[in-house]
């Protein structure tokens, strides 16, 4: 038996999240169906992160075991021919026996993407911002208030490090042994989209919040992003963020930013840290 | 009674075209439902063009009649609050009694959008182009062959003017009195997307084919776009396009480009030609 690691990109708009569910389209379900069409076998895959409905990925990972048959270097091509256009296998590689996309993951990077729009009105008083989001509505969290980026960067720095992140955990996830996690980096990058694909991108500003950590609690990145937006709009003081974390109280943190702004960018394994021993 | 002209933008991905159909989501159906929610009345709207399933619009038009009640300058705002995010009312304006979005239209501009990608393979031999189209797959026609733009521009010029365009008409549309139409302009604009919203836009080339005419036969723009792609890839000679039109034979023209690359950009009425007499 070979152990195969898939790297997967997907547009989460049309899926009820990663995890397989009866009678609902999910990313895991579509990939297992495609594996069945390609190999004729029922193959179960283990994903690194169970992304929620509407959340996207550029670098989700999953492992499965497979016997003889399709060569490893044809798996991505064969699956892509069988998968819907919104799910793409970026690569498939063989790993040592027992390698597991979830248990062997050492960390992940998520991106949370904001679209910063001023509150505009057209001649009729109708908010122009509504039109702006026609084509990007499923891929970004639109914020119509001015945001104080310096305050957000200060708050982001306070979120880095090893903390009990219970304040950034939503109810409803799996039970965890501990709510202590290490956030290696929270990086804010703003850029202006000069001439994009859609007219709505013209003169829009994108603010990406890239969060890298060793693990994440349920909805943690979305609550971090919502908290940063609340800091940027003055609802929460940047200087208060350490106390919010200290409190371990979900009520003291900011709102949960919506799923469509979230992208699972990359999963890190032992060898990504440069001291693998395969 | 007031006569109201709506200008409408929509993402056609989730709709079975413009025209209302029982039990299927359509753009006209969603707008009539929203009008009912906003006014409490059953109001029928007349659209300018019956776009097909998957076709988009930035400037579709539609008219309807309405009595007292909601002020004209609040209609767009009220409808947008009631419509799904993929349909946006750009404007609502009062027109003279009897004005009709379809019968008073003097012309339209459609855009057909191609994404030009070289045939790339990654290290595993899997076509990279498949990944590139994850997020733009519903908004563009991806072409992986090199295209001869000079030949396409020559063919485009041959499509301009007043001709019997029966060769560019698909079966299945409404019956028309004549297949003679005037195409005022076919313009090709290529541009490179430097740093777009999605990574797949990086270094992609967009080729827009903008077609303005007094009227269009069923699938005419999609067949014109497919014919131009066939000219660009050498399947049809640019010098043969006048004879293709002359033949009035659908079999001699090129393939029908897929719906997701097509956008209804603008509808022209009498006053847009500068000699209105309202």
Descriptions of predicted regions:
Chain A
Residues 1-278:
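Structured-RNA-binding interfaces characteristic of tRNA pseudouridine synthases
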